[in-house]
Amino acid sequence: MAVKASGRFVPPSAFAAGTGKAFTGAYAWNAPREAVGRERPLTRDEMRQVQGVLSTINRLPYFLRSLFTSRYDYIRRNKSPVHGFYFLTSTFQRRLWPRIERVNQRHEMNTDASLLFLAERDHYARLPGMNDKELKKFAARISSQLFMMYEELSDAWVDAHGEKESLFTDEAQAHLYGHVAGAARAFNISPLYWKKYRKGQMTTRQAYSAIARLFNDEWWTHQLKGQRMRWHEALLIAVGEVNKDRSPYASNHAIRDVRARRQANLEFLKSCDLENRETGERIDLISKVMGSISNPEIRRMELMNTIAGIERYAAAEGDVGMFITLTAPSKYHPTRQVGKGESKTVQLNHGWNDEAFNPKDAQRYLCRIWSLMRTAFKDNDLQAYGLRVVEPHHDGTPHWHMMLFCNPRQRNQIIEIMRRYALKEDGDERGAARNRFQAKHLNRGGAAGYIAKYISKNIDGYALDGQLDNDTGRPLKDTAAAVTAWASTWRIPQFKTVGLPTMGAYRELRKLPHGVSIADEFDERVEAARAAADSGDFALYISAQGGANVPRDCQTVRVARSPSDDVNEYEEEVERVVGIYAPHLGARHIHITRTTDWRIVPKVPVVEPLTLKSGIAAPRSPVNNCGKLTGGDTSLPAPTPSEHAAAVLNLVDDGVIEWNDTEVVRALRGALKHDLRTPNRQQRNGSPLKPHEIAPSARLTRSERLQITRIRVDLGQNGIRPQRWELEALARGATVNYEGVNFRYPVNDEWPGFN
């Protein structure tokens, strides 16, 4: 029988306080699972949209196509087809595709300059994804078409003026240059001397040099490779692959490309020597290169010595220092950062989409406003000098750091002028006053340490161990490779002095023998500059050259140049540095610093002598099947067809036999057949990149070439732009149909037998 308790009971203990975390279960088997549900399939309309966007992606270059297709496949597999649909329609189609289109529009063929290469428009649009082999073929086609155009124009000029000598005038060459160079401008290049042509100052010699470049396949290959690299990088910037979250400063492809080119250049330098033209003496080329400012370590030390010298000179003159930062407007930045501290995120800047500016455009903007500032300094009799450093933001947009010194009474006025021009364009946008222009006063003795970090970051990352980049949060030592790749890709000079004597004269003075005076040859002013450069005291060098902001013609020492004995591949004289001269003593009074004439030659291959470490070995079996040569049975090897043909030609030269002898014809035919490689008719090349060889058409006669010019003009009046093969067919008498209208022109035959 149960005992019934009465009275009060002790209440149970309180529940444990919650941790705020979701229940996960004590074991794996009772952990919460996602609800079982069926994913929503795409509708028919959504499937059509997906197929349309994928077809657009498939038309992109491979490096972009693979990027988007792999990202779409990853989202579709790991999330759902609906998420993949949102990625294609929202992220790509609405946000990224307009940026890609705008970049391609900025780099497409300039048909306003010329319509000659209209047939190559689609091929030129594939340039950012073009391989080297296809690019070289494309360059060869461009140069050959320009050469044919030049020949046709030359023949037309001779027919109009009567004599061939009329071609060798400034007027004729300027006329030919205008047409050929104008057609070349369709590929977004600026031909040499184009500005002089527009001003009417073109000479025959200048026209020859410029046109020779336009006929050179290698010159076009170099131009197209540069465009391909910048177009490729601009597309990666547009799709957000260059920023602090992906690859800061430059894309991974650009970093690899620059590293590969530098490695190839290094291997070339290792394979060459410097040879004395007179004595034949040879020295290692790579050792001389690594001992010059081409070595990043030496270049960094020279810059640091220059900064320290500028600071000492400013202290001696009583000038004060400023640290200026100039940044381009927001429309030059492809991305923007949102948030603060570690929570900062990168977002696309839609204000960039209208113009799609690249880093080179931002650099041109900064150079333009700096030229306006310098003009204002000159108008107000203000002087500043120092050093300029260009470095990129995390998205590749450049900004300037300037270490300037000036008179204390002029500092406020200089800062106000710079601020006014820095904010002249879009100065009312949000954050412009704070971010577009910054000016800090430098304490005496702290300038070198303040800017040293920027120099190391832009060269080799020296002494930056443990320091982090403000833009990316990554170690500064690791960002040096990306910054140098950025500068190489966009052809942006990173360092430049402002208002200081030339560095070329400083380096030439340091080439002179140590401690040897040149006062007897020049005067004490020149000797003071030599002694300052010899000791590496850049402050004394500035003073010896006349001080800061001195025009070059008024400096004490300048670099002397002289035309070289050799000409380049375009038959131009090449000026080379030979020494120094003092303008106040006359330009003809030159001191030669480069007395030896060197040339770059390949290294002589080292041939190791044949070493026989063993004597005659015993035969592997008692039977010797080798025959023994005797004196009477020795037979000479039969001559090859080439050797036989050479012997026959010697007999012809000696007058023993005649050219029309059947033996001569038979010998030459045999030599030619022997040297030619016999093609295998049973095998065909199935590669689409290697088209089958097509026999070239017959050469056009002179009358047919003249007929082509008349046909092109006649068709142009009807609004027709014919291709090259159509013009040749019409000149030979064929009939060509253009939009239902047949065109045929009479043939001017030069063969009287066919009349």
Model-derived features: where do they sit?
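Right-hand nucleic-acid polymerase module
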Residues: 1-396, 408-755
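Short hydrophobic/aromatic beta-strand micro-patches
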Residues: 403-407
